[in-house]
């Protein structure tokens, strides 16, 4: 097996500004015009033809004739019976930790009096209906069911719909059962996103769609989120990525394993090592080659390593600065006192601190969510959490005294904006209150 290109050490300080910018560029994910047009056609057909279009696309893209789009309860029970106890116990432990972490994210009611007689509240309500897309293929992702289904249940979403390409893996069906998801449909690709966004005879329309997917799924989510008749989505999606910051005390084998755990996701994944220690970087390159030989998805990982980087910096501070500029989906701090620099980390989806916090823990069972912003969106987007399955509402209630105390402020600002109806809504009430007060005084 030929070695990868992931064995060339790059000295950051010796690179020009343009070269540094190029080093932090990600593999292109822009949908081609062909994909954009194809997805648009799929969306329109599903909206117009419903289940008929869904069956046609399943035959064309998944090479499966789907008679019943919805998976029955008996089919889910049969899938559960086929799974080993080890897998079931592992999923149960993962769900427990995910529940603990996401339950802790419940937002308290905000209830304050901003001035006498003016009461303001912030309350939350669950999104009524959500759709979860779970990719299929050679590597089913039941962990994503747990990461999406658990917060949806905790939030109290009344309807949770799950779509996955046929045939749906037993692990995915069991994970759905574990999360209390009863509406499961064997549809994949852009057509599944269309079904959840618009609804069909079998698939209910939802308000918001979650979950990862290929370029067609990603483009479908983008398009439905921009249509008035579509649905909201969780966040923009891109290929998986990890950045590791390592000092001279780091363990090369651990670093290599974490880098490869992301590289095996797909050929467009990207992994980066930043270290002030050239010896560590070189040792990691050797470890990567040795561990690659043991991986079932070695060919995929090798492709990902072609656009990955081993970067040697001047010092740890430079590593931090580069990481914040890149904004990785996963950030691993393989340094001696990671807690001393966490306050300097501004842009990352999820951070893993120390030798004993592998990225795999967050992917599966530590309790944090593995649905994270990628492609630099960490500068503006957060990791998925309970807040994504609820919406906030504000409430205000003014007493007569409260309105009188605030009236002149509102009237002045409304007049400044030349919105006289706004001003009048206050003035009429103030007049009514003053008239009532005058009448009482006369009595």
UniProtKB/Swiss-Prot annotation:
Details of cofactor binding: Binds 1 zinc ion per subunit.
Record-linked InterPro entries: Ald_DH/histidinol_DH (IPR016161), Histidinol_DH_CS (IPR001692), Histidinol_DH_monofunct (IPR022695), Hstdl_DH (IPR012131)
Reaction catalyzed: L-histidinol + 2 NAD(+) + H2O = L-histidine + 2 NADH + 3 H(+)
Gene3D superfamilies reported for this sequence: 1.20.5.1300, Nitrogenase molybdenum iron protein domain
Listed pathway(s): Amino-acid biosynthesis; L-histidine biosynthesis; L-histidine from 5-phospho-alpha-D-ribose 1-diphosphate: step 9/9
GO molecular function: histidinol dehydrogenase activity; NAD binding; zinc ion binding
A biological process term (GO) from this entry: L-histidine biosynthetic process
Coiled coil: none
Enzyme nomenclature, EC number: 1.1.1.23
Keywords: Amino-acid biosynthesis, Histidine biosynthesis, Metal-binding, NAD, Oxidoreductase, Zinc
Enzymatic class: oxidoreductase
Pfam families: Histidinol_dh (PF00815)
Any one annotated GO CC term: cytoplasm
Reported function: Catalyzes the sequential NAD-dependent oxidations of L-histidinol to L-histidinaldehyde and then to L-histidine.
Family: Belongs to the histidinol dehydrogenase family.
Subunit record text: Homodimer.
NCBIfam families listed in its UniProt record: hisD
Name of the protein in question: Histidinol dehydrogenase
Taxonomic path: Bacteria, Pseudomonadati, Pseudomonadota, Gammaproteobacteria, Enterobacterales
Gene from which the chain derives: hisD
